[in-house]
């Protein structure tokens, strides 16, 4: 009977090298597959949100919900306006002043996961350029998505929001906000130049008023955002440039 021979050092090194090569080939494919799965989840999330938006509008004279624009979250009488994402609790500090269950879409959605991209770490500490390089967390840690402030003309006193019928079907209502800047998550709405995430292969998912949900590349987004005329991002009705009314 011949004794069993173990691996030689050279053979072991060859096996390790082969494993390393295979891992190098597989990891990018796995990362791409993970990203594709996250994009699919985002598309599904935003489609459900748009269904909830239209249900809300059907019950509210065709009006969009309050976008949770921070400067107008409190009404003139001091009460908090119910918004798409939350109703501000003035007795609590951030992030505890924001709660899903107080938002007007919650009764339709009823699932916190719908508000978040699987690849977005909402509690991560990041360097804020806007806040002078400080390491901070987001104030609002509920959602990866922001509503377009166009529904109130980007104004604190823009209540009530526009009617859906006043918007063009392909105007953009929701997008994935740029996660690299925590300050952009101080509320539930944004200006277009505050930007979109690039975590999906240099692009993000966006939703239009007609309920369609699409992928946009960063270069396409910023090209449209920089357009001085009314476009799908700057889309407040009744104005030439889609920005604030005069």
Annotate each PLM feature:
Residues 2-44:
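Amphipathic alpha-helical segments typified by the pilin-like N-terminal helix
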Residues 40-246:
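Short, well-structured segments within or immediately adjacent to enzyme catalytic domains
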Residues 1-2, 240:
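Intrinsically disordered, low-complexity regions enriched in serine, threonine, proline
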